[in-house]
Amino acid sequence: MEPAGHSSATHNIVVPNANPTQPQPLAPAMREEGATLSPPNTWSSSSVEFLDDADDNRLLFTCTFTLPHGTVLSSATYADGFHEQYLTIGDNFLARLEPKGQSFILSAAAASVKQRIFARVTMPDGALRACELLCEFETDRAKITVLALRSAFSLQASHVSSNFHVFTFITKHSSTCALTHIDYASIPYLGLLPTDLIGKSLLAFVYSPDVHVVRQAHIDLHNSRGKIVKSIADLRLVAHNGSILRCQTEWSAYVNPWTRKMELVVARHRICSLPIGDSDVISSPPPGIQSNTLPPVMAKTFEDELRTIMNKPVPSTSRHSHHHHHSSLKDQNQGFPANIDLGAYIDKIVEQLVVNSTAQQQQKVAVAAAAAAQAAQAAVVATAQIRKVASAPPTTSTDPPLSYTQINCLENVHRLLKSQSRPESPAKQDEPFDEKKYPPQTPLTREALTLHTKRFEDEYKDTWCRRLKRLSDDVPSSPPAKRTTPIHWTSSSQNHYRTMAPAPPPPPGKNYQITYTPLDDLTDQKSTNTKSDVENVAYPISGSKFSTPMRLSIDGLLPRGATSTGGASPTSGTNSPPVFPKTSSSSSLLMLRDSQN
């Protein structure tokens, strides 16, 4: 079907099936629209855009070809200069495109149903021209509508008036300085297709003398931790035909919160003037014209500098804000807010005191405020000078000291606040002092101090006695221990043991170990055995408890010259136990003394 307004179109149509009675309808497109390619972009199915393009005489030709070979099935040309032999049936349409355009069309056919692609097409005169391709893909074929791209600065364009309209577009580049995105709407202004720039260096379309502007912008981005910064000067860009465009650029960066490095930089370029040179930025540059961009060797050097800046961690927040809050911290240390001068600060305090005071106190406050205001007027100049010094970059490590006038003013304010801290009632102030109501004071003598100290000591003593008594009352007392008497003891046995004398104390100057042993029953004393149980019992001593041999001696109990039974010495080394003399008190006592060899 021929679009409206183009009756002189030339058609080349071929029928795929030779049998006209059995037409084969085209298979419906069952694929859904997928992710768009970059730079290709999806376009709406509405015909409004197509009609606008047709009325604007941008329509060049339409073509239907097979996939993936690109054999032309039908074509129709609408623009002047396109003859019938430009696209004939059986020709290869993909051969009319540059290599990048061929790969993008085949990739878009596998991903979506409709796609908008920007590519350069070979014109009838053999020149490559940037065009817009509206593609509709089916299972084994594709229909392409080719629209011409025109310069935004061309006088033939109907949407360009005498007054220039400001245009803004966005570019993005990674930490390797490679462009990852550029608005396709910038094509009429730059003449560069997204396929010409994506993957290439940022400096590929920057005017060579303005490279330092890009470098300084990256340094400012690093210092501001990725916040928006403006270029120090207008950035000049080079169009496709070699013309120069002047634009105002703002930069912003994404900083990785873990590595603190800039990973992506976004630039917003605002073209605000006509190009310097040929206004047809879409056309190819004339032959023999030298490019205005940096040579590859110099461009690589600047790219390395930009990579170094972006791969360096940005300064921390505390370090960045140290200089920003330097002056405010100084003012806070001086005792008044940073954004209010000293005179206004004192006036505010005096106003609060006057409002909160009584009628009789207002006169006193006014007098004190007048004295403080005089010092405040002299301190305003000194405060401004100190703030000016504090806002400037610090040249020395020490802070500037406070001036004498400022210290005097602050002291007046403190005295004023101190005098108003404990206001007294007017009745008490006017009442005369009566000495009769108050007793005479006791003179401060040594006796008075002694009595005073004794009185406090008695109070402390009584207090501690009460505390100890309260603690003793809280603790429950345990009942006295009761010693049970053996069952087989008679009353006579109990009385006999009660009448026994206590054991004698050990002699002084010697180490003794006293051990009590159970006593024998009185009924067993009539036994024929004359030795006591203590004499018949052997006491084995484990050698593991003593590091050296030990011998037993009873020299402390026996009189001089006395020996044990049998004439054996206690230190003779025999295993027989020692024999003690039988006395009423020694029958219940065993005394041992340790002596090392």
From Swiss-Prot:
Compositional bias per record (Basic and acidic residues), positions renumbered to this chain: 425-438
Keyword Signal listed: no
Source organism superkingdom: Eukaryota
Subcellular localization: Nucleus; Cytoplasm
Compositionally skewed regions (Low complexity) per UniProt: 561-577
GO CC, alphabetical: cytoplasm; nucleus
Ranges of biased composition (kind: Polar residues): 487-497
Pfam families with a match to the protein in the record: PAS_11
Molecular-function annotations in GO: RNA polymerase II-specific DNA-binding transcription factor binding
GO biological process annotation, one example: regulation of development, heterochronic
Key words of the record: Cytoplasm, Developmental protein, Differentiation, Nucleus, Transcription, Transcription regulation
InterPro entries reported in the protein's UniProt record: PAS, PAS-like_dom_sf, Period_circadian_regulator
Claim: Cytoplasm is one of the keywords in the record: yes
Domain PAS: 155-223
Region described as Disordered: spans on this chain: 1-44, 313-335, 418-450, 473-509, 555-597
Gene3D superfamilies (alphabetical): PAS domain
Entry function: Transcriptional repressor which interacts with the promoter region of target genes. Has a specific role in developmental timing where it regulates temporal expression of a number of miRNAs and mRNAs. Controls temporal cell fate transition during embryonic and early larval development by restricting the expression of specific miRNAs, including let-7, miR-48, lin-4, miR-35 and miR-58. Restricts the accumulation of lin-29 in the hypodermis to the larval L4 stage, thus controlling terminal differentiation of seam cells.
Name assigned to this protein: Period protein homolog lin-42
Native source organism of the sequence: Caenorhabditis elegans
Upper lineage: Eukaryota, Metazoa, Ecdysozoa, Nematoda, Chromadorea
